[in-house]
Amino acid sequence: MVFFWRKSDVEKKAEKGDKNAILELIKQGKKEKAEKILKKYASQREDLAELLFELYVQEGKLVQAYPLLKKYGDKIGKAKERAKVYQAVGEYQKAIEEFLKVGDFESLYNVAKIYHQLEKPDKALEYAQRAEKLVPYEKKEELENFITQLKKELGLIEEKKESILDKLRRGLQKTKEAVEFGVLFRGRKVDEEFFEELEEMLVKADVGVKTAVELTEKLRKEAIRKNIKEGEKIKELLKKELKELLKNCQGELKIPEKVGAVLLFVGVNGSGKTTTIGKLAHQLKQKGKKVLLVAGDTFRAAAIEQLEVWAKRAGVDIVKKEEGSDPGAVVYEGMKKAKEEGYEVVLVDTAGRLHTKEPLINELRKIKKVIQKFDKEEPSETLLVIDATTGQNAIQQAKVFKEAVDITGIVVTKLDGSAKGGAVVAICRELKIPIKLVGVGEGIDDLQPFDADAYVEALLE
């Protein structure tokens, strides 16, 4: 018996472009259906384009709203909505203009944050202080902290520079809160129960079961041999063992002084690849390098758009094509531009569709061949980006990418968002690939070289 789904009268009217019927669909929660219909009419009808624009903004789909804004300008949406869309795609000057038309606290605060992003702390401070006059109570502390930060950047308040150790301390805070090594070591008698708890904590921190068992057994034997009775002394021994284990997993980023040094980034979608590329581009630009980004992940429009936003933020150039383009062709164009126009560093983004293993491996190998057509010694680095929050799963993912290309270094991201900070130990031990960089926060300067000693100190504090 076959059942046919009958469309309601509302749906039939909506499909003919009836605005009230489309609004009724949205009211009924059928937003996807409404969106599909609105897309069909948006290029011809301004009233439906405005409705689609508002729907996108409500759903947080700001990037998708941008083409409508580009076509209709200030004929659609409210100033604050338009500002948020411009901000999302990196059209910062237009975003500022729209926010200033509103002039409320939120808008002025957003203007201040945009100027800060554009590295204009003086303008950021001007608008933050204007926002201060309108600040609601619940935002007062946040704004005060932001103003203090701006004053430090402008040299109006002396600031103590945050060291790598301080950044790692901050980044590993969630792991320390979840695992509490300090509580175990402080004032505890060293007995069998102590070692059982230590092993559990190491497993919880995600150093890997095998590593946790081996480390605990080694410390147990050492405690018997040296007649150690205090937890603090075991802590020092554990630090020594972890530093020894990690010493071969520390490596500097290799960027030769020449035109067209390539850093190829691989990793699963969502690992933080694009953000890592953006932050590194910013840091290299600050050092005076001429940097080019290549949007080689052509399977996701969002990846291309995100990299474009980072290029604007870092003040560097980008080579990109539309979604669905051949990644090899994009990389070819990027390499050609780099050689012809003298770009010193080329940062290449790639797709990370792990569920399609064979096509992914073939695609990465093809990209590498394209790079080597221009320079047989490149890429200088092939960096695997791993999300610390995925813990042990990251190791399984890494093995797939190792099949495709020679990985020369690892970037561990989102250490600040994970209670699995010990995964760095497991990654080092299992993969035996140097960890070149770690992401310890959302700030543009929170991508840091990996320092094994500082990492161990921060983890066990």
From Swiss-Prot:
GO CC field: cytoplasm; plasma membrane
Biological process, per Gene Ontology: protein targeting; SRP-dependent cotranslational protein targeting to membrane
Entry EC no(s): 3.6.5.4
Family: Belongs to the GTP-binding SRP family. FtsY subfamily.
GO molecular function, one term: signal recognition particle binding
Reaction catalysed by this enzyme: GTP + H2O = GDP + phosphate + H(+)
The entry's keywords: Cell inner membrane, Cell membrane, Cytoplasm, GTP-binding, Hydrolase, Membrane, Nucleotide-binding, Receptor, TPR repeat
Subunit structure: Part of the signal recognition particle protein translocation system, which is composed of SRP and FtsY.
Classification via InterPro entries: AAA+_ATPase (IPR003593), P-loop_NTPase (IPR027417), Signal_recog_particl_SRP54_hlx (IPR013822), SR_rcpt_FtsY (IPR004390), SRP/SRP_N (IPR036225), SRP54_GTPase_dom (IPR000897), SRP54_N_sf (IPR042101), TPR-like_helical_dom_sf (IPR011990)
Membrane topology: Peripheral membrane protein
Main localization (coarse): membrane
Statement: the UniProt record of this protein carries the keyword Cell inner membrane: yes
Start-end of each TPR repeat: 105-138
Source organism of this protein record: Aquifex aeolicus (strain VF5)
Protein's job: Involved in targeting and insertion of nascent membrane proteins into the cytoplasmic membrane. Acts as a receptor for the complex formed by the signal recognition particle (SRP) and the ribosome-nascent chain (RNC).
Location of the protein in the cell: Cell inner membrane; Cytoplasm
PANTHER family named in the record: SIGNAL RECOGNITION PARTICLE RECEPTOR SUBUNIT ALPHA
Name by which UniProt lists this protein: Signal recognition particle receptor FtsY
Residues holding GTP: 267-274, 349-353, 413-416
